[in-house]
């Protein structure tokens, strides 16, 4: 959790939960028979938070950003989801080996996508710049 000043000068609490990884079962309990039957998967953050349980910590009116250890964005919810009550639903993300942060929806560019071309840095979403080597590899991959 981090606190940032919004445009109106008011401090607001934002979630930034880091490094989710797949686990067999939540540490605070074993799998239920129903979870075994359907083959349920679980994620746990580096500070021990269960993915399903910590989703309630995120605000319904903030954009959600899923990013890797280098800050590259691979998932984003920057528009309300009609199937989730027109909220910015963090449940749309599945952050295996990723972190999830929230920012004010107005601070998330409309054209931001989870395609690796954007970065999450210091609480902000910015267009990614590529090194010459990354550009060469990208061009080679597009030839295939």
Q: PLM ranges: what are they?
A:
Residues 2-144:
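Interaction-interface detector
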